[in-house]
Amino acid sequence: MKIVLLGPPGAGKGTQAKSISNKYSIPHISTGDIFRKNISENTPLGIEAKGYIDNGQLVPDEVTINMVKDRLQQDDCKVGYLLDGFPRTVAQADALNNFLVDKNEQLDTALLIKVPNEFILERMTGRRVCPSCGASYHVKFNPPTNEGKCDLCGSEVIQRKDDTVETVKERLDVYQKETQPLIEFYGEKGLLSEVDGTKAINEVFRGICELLGNNK
């Protein structure tokens, strides 16, 4: 089973990706992990990517695509895989499609975890973390017993910079611009599947399993 996972920041993609990977015995392939591995191992592609990053430039599609292609040709991908963070652009989606066509293979589905912006804002901006022990809370869904204080060590909990309203809105804007064309791309190919990401984690996963069925 070959799956592309789509969804906004804060949609719970990481949690669901792990569950999908375990249930269907396919590797969860994160673009971030691929980049880190290539850079840490000083592969030719990693060195090239690091050069762009160090200069404050975006890594070109060609480099990213080649990294992903290399990963998809490893033995553990023979039974399928779950792609998370790739493709991000229609050009990358086209490249993935061409790669699969050349191998006489095809994508099974592009799975979109749908969550409204207002829900994401509430979920992400309400997150709090203890800077001392790392415990995490949510002002609405999982508040500390003593308001503003960590239950474990008593330190004052804080909001991370990534979770401010301004930052979350910026990330959602970027996601919308990047992903809407992808949603249309996969929709036109009849490959788009959607699941309601506002439900409880186990309910979202149940919905995903219903969409994916027992295929492997």
From Swiss-Prot:
Residues 126-163 are annotated as: LID. Its EC number is 2.7.4.3. It is found in: Cytoplasm. One of its GO terms (molecular function) is ATP binding. Keywords: ATP-binding, Cytoplasm, Kinase, Metal-binding, Nucleotide biosynthesis, Nucleotide-binding, Transferase, Zinc. Zn(2+) binds at residues 130, 133, 150, 153. One of its GO terms (biological process) is AMP salvage. Pathway: Purine metabolism; AMP biosynthesis via salvage pathway; AMP from ADP: step 1/1. AMP binds at residues 31, 36, 57-59, 85-88, 92, 160, 171. ATP binds at residues 10-15, 127, 136-137, 199. GO terms for cellular component: cytoplasm. The keyword Cytoplasm applies. Residues 30-59 are annotated as: NMP. PANTHER family: NUCLEOTIDE KINASE (PTHR23359). Monomer. Catalyzes the reversible transfer of the terminal phosphate group between ATP and AMP. Plays an important role in cellular energy homeostasis and in adenine nucleotide metabolism. NCBIfam families: adk (TIGR01351), PRK00279.1-2 (NF001380), PRK00279.1-3 (NF001381), PRK14527.1 (NF011100). Belongs to the adenylate kinase family. HAMAP family: Adenylate_kinase_Adk. Consists of three domains, a large central CORE domain and two small peripheral domains, NMPbind and LID, which undergo movements during catalysis. The LID domain closes over the site of phosphoryl transfer upon ATP binding. Assembling and dissambling the active center during each catalytic cycle provides an effective means to prevent ATP hydrolysis. Some bacteria have evolved a zinc-coordinating structure that stabilizes the LID domain. This is Adenylate kinase. It comes from Clostridium beijerinckii (strain ATCC 51743 / NCIMB 8052). The lineage of its organism: Bacteria, Bacillati, Bacillota, Clostridia, Eubacteriales. The gene is adk.
